[in-house]
């Protein structure tokens, strides 16, 4: 059987997604000198904020770097919220990141971090409005790098759209992916892939050691990945108990 050949301009009734051209911002600082922001498509926001529209929402919420996880919640219907409701850190690892800052592994967690609901949203809006505005705000805050997570399959696509916008603004990024094929197809600049289910990208809930290790290795790969589009497996496994 011959290999599949793709011919430019050939039309087909079968939709074949096209991976967008690579975007890439090189890392120019050591991790110990970086202020790092968290960005998630998993629907995380402050309890005091307006909930996301579960049918589709391209807005985003700012989460302060000093906010308590007890004051956060999730509005998202596209993935099982069981783990993240036990521990926000398994999708939005803000406590592990604060620990890494305290230990000097990174300079600081950014004063603003971002949550949005990537499932069912308008992809054009994410590309033309949400992503560029998130990038602008992070740039204004002097963010040096961004660590992302995503929930469902559509979330992973939306997260990469935002990731690419941040990267295009001059900030290097890396996403912790539960669905590596989705982020690859959508043109992730950099990604890591622990063996985790959707809804616990940063590791098992209430397992700060695993979460810290995943964040640590993700940030190391931010520096070590040599070119756009590479996805590095991480040696951590969590199987959700359902």
Swiss-Prot record:
* EC class: oxidoreductase
Show the GO cellular component annotation of the record. Answer: cytoplasm
Supply the alphabetized keyword list. Answer: Cytoplasm, Oxidoreductase, Selenocysteine
EC annotation from Swiss-Prot or TrEMBL: 1.21.4.1
Its recorded reaction(s) are: [PrdC protein]-Se-L-selenocysteinyl-S-L-cysteine + 5-aminopentanoate = [PrdC protein]-L-selenocysteine/L-cysteine + D-proline
Question: Highest taxon of the source?
Answer: Bacteria
Query: What modifications follow translation?
Result: This subunit is carbonylated in vitro on an unidentified residue.
The catalytic residues are 152 (nucleophile)
Write out the annotated subcellular location. Answer: Cytoplasm
From the record, give the transmembrane residue ranges: none
**Main site of residence?**
cytoplasm
Please name the GO terms that the record assigns under molecular function.
D-proline reductase activity
InterPro entries associated with the record: D_pro_red_PrdB (IPR022787), Various_sel_PB (IPR010187)
Q: What else is known?
A: The reaction mechanism first involves the formation of an adduct (and not a Schiff base) between the nitrogen of proline and the pyruvoyl group of the alpha subunit. The selenol anion of selenocysteine in PrdB nucleophilically attacks the alpha-carbon, resulting in cleavage of the N-C bond of the proline ring. This intermediate is then transformed to the oxidized gamma subunit containing a mixed selenide/sulfide group and to the 5-aminovalerate adduct of the alpha subunit. The final product, 5-aminovalerate, is formed by hydrolysis.
| UniProt subunit comment | Consists of 3 subunits of 23, 26 and 45 kDa (alpha, gamma and beta respectively). The molecular weight of the complex is approximately 870 kDa, suggesting a decameric structure, if all 3 subunits are present in equal stoichiometry.
Its annotated function is as follows: D-proline reductase catalyzes the reductive cleavage of a C-N bond in D-proline resulting in the formation of 5-aminovalerate. The alpha subunit has been shown to bind D-proline, presumably via the pyruvoyl group.
Q: Which NCBIfam families match?
A: D_pro_red_PrdB, various_sel_PB
What's the protein here called?
D-proline reductase subunit gamma
Q: Which organism does this record belong to?
A: Acetoanaerobium sticklandii (strain ATCC 12662 / DSM 519 / JCM 1433 / CCUG 9281 / NCIMB 10654 / HF)
Q: What is the gene called?
A: prdB
């Amino acid at each position: 059987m011959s290999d599949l050949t793709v011919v430019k301009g050939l039309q087909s009734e079968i939709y074949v997604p096209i991976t967008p051209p690579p975007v890439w911002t090189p890392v120019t600082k050591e991790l110990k000198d970086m202020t790092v922001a968290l960005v998630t498509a998993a629907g995380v926001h402050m309890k005091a904020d307006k909930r996301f529209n579960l049918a589709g929402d391209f807005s985003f919420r700012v989460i302060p770097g000093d906010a308590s996880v007890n004051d956060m919640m999730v509005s998202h219907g596209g993935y099982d919220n069981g783990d993240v409701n036990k521990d926000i850190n398994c999708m939005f690892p803000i406590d592990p990141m604060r620990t890494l800052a305290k230990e000097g592994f990174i300079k600081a967690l950014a004063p603003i971090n971002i949550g949005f609901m990537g499932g069912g949203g308008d992809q054009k809006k994410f590309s033309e409005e949400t992503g560029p505005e998130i990038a602008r705000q992070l740039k204004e805050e002097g963010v040096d790098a961004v660590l992302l997570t995503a929930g469902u399959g559509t979330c992973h696509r939306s997260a990469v759209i935002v990731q690419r916008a941040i990267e295009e603004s001059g900030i290097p990024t890396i996403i912790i992916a539960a669905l590596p094929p989705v982020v690859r197809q959508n043109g992730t600049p950099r990604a890591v892939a622990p063996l985790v289910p959707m809804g616990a990208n940063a590791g098992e809930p209430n397992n700060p050691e695993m979460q810290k290790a995943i964040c640590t290795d993700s940030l190391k790969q931010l520096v070590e990945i040599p070119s756009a589009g590479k996805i590095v497996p991480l040696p951590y496994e969590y199987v959700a108990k359902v």
